[in-house]
Amino acid sequence: MVDCPDSVLVIAWGNPLREDDAVAWHVLEGLRSLKPRPGLPALHLRHAHQLTPEMAECLSRAAGVVFVDARRDGTPGEVRCEDVAPGAGSNPLAHSLSPQALLLYAEQLYGRAPKAVVLSIAGERFGMGEALSPVVRRAIPTAMRVVLRQAKAWVGTPAGTTTTRPA
């Protein structure tokens, strides 16, 4: 749970057994490996196979949220960062949600939806397997820099990384 309003929640989701669909998990592990230092914003890191309604409370407490995911369109390895706002986009009875729907849940259930972006990396291969394609693997440092730049824009630079894992 994110208890600090001056921290940024990073949620990486995807299937770690579907090649490039796992790129978000690798971005999260790269962020987790960073040693605390001056200028590093406070991050709460979380990975999941899908976005679920139970995440709404945690989102409502963060200064901002970066959703990290793979995507099928675009040039493989291309990193895209787009603002996202609360809104429809998922079946309310579905087991997984879009970032927009999850933000809407946070707003409606807990009175607050944080600023949020979706950082996506275009994949090349989505078959069965655990290895990333080389072009997607090379995009990980760029994606990490985008996450850190966005977090600094939202909260400044309090040092530290806190990790949380799905229950």
Feature annotation, model-predicted:
Residues 1-121, 130-142, 147-167:
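N-terminal catalytic or cofactor-binding beta/alpha core of small enzyme domains
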Residues 124:
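Short "lid" loop at the C-terminus of a central beta-strand within the Rossmann-like core
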Residues 127:
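Glycine-rich phosphate/diphosphate-binding loops and the adjacent beta-loop-alpha structural elements
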